[in-house]
Amino acid sequence: MATNAKPVYQRILLKLSGEALQGAEGFGIDASVLDRMAQEVKELVELGIQVGVVIGGGNLFRGAGLAQAGMNRVVGDHMGMLATVMNGLAMRDALHRAYVNARLMSAIPLNGVCDNYSWAEAISLLRHNRVVIFAAGTGNPFFTTDSAACLRGIEIEADVVLKATKVDGVYSADPVKNPDATLYEQLTYQDVLERELKVMDLAAFTLARDHNLPIRVFNMNKPGALRRVVMGENEGTLITKEVAAVTK
């Protein structure tokens, strides 16, 4: 597909997994990966795109194992929320070092560390081309950061949620386990539900579906993939309400 002269999106919600930040380290934050992502976000800002970001916390804390060992789920989820704030602080710092204006907002009050989440303030910042990082998930336990990404995407009236992953999009099966798995170019919400494809958890996905929020799944590890997505190229998998499923 020919590259469009202008971006096809005006405002996006970028969902990054915490694992994406750890690079090859296996834990924590890889500074080189963080800086590369900041540069890619900077490219979008320079294209005039308004960018909201939600980051997971799996690189710093995984509550599932501790929950199995007896930890209260609410406590574990609160710890996970704090992990997303730590990632948000790192991303804000990386963006500032790249000379990008960025604001970090938390769904739980952390005075002196970052701003409290405010819908009106977030909209104002986005309109002034500031990157807004939304941390601490939804502020409630039992909800994933994918749910937070869809919720914030709906609230800020984003054109699309861009879900960055470690694979090239949505496949018919796990491409790591099955090399013959098919990569889908386009799917409908119904396709995903009927085929039980793993895009995100059901609560997050149905939230996006009910509010007709498109989702684009792509590989953030591919250099330039994010830019190609916003310029309308065939990168990753697009999930919408009415587009007929097409496979590569």
UniProtKB/Swiss-Prot annotation:
Catalyzed reactions per annotation: UMP + ATP = UDP + ADP
Superkingdom of the organism of origin: Bacteria
One BP annotation, GO: 'de novo' CTP biosynthetic process
GO molecular function, one term: UMP kinase activity
Mechanisms controlling activity: Allosterically activated by GTP. Inhibited by UTP.
Keywords: Allosteric enzyme, ATP-binding, Cytoplasm, Kinase, Nucleotide-binding, Pyrimidine biosynthesis, Transferase
Positions that bind UMP: 57, 77, 138-145
A Pfam entry, by short name: AA_kinase
Ranges where the record places region Involved in allosteric activation by GTP: 23-28
EC number(s) per entry: 2.7.4.22
GO cellular component: cytosol
Cellular compartments annotated: Cytoplasm
Positions of ATP binding: 15-18, 58, 62, 165, 171, 174
Class of this enzyme: transferase
UniProt family annotation: Belongs to the UMP kinase family.
Function of the molecule: Catalyzes the reversible phosphorylation of UMP to UDP.
Subunit comment: Homohexamer.
Protein name: Uridylate kinase
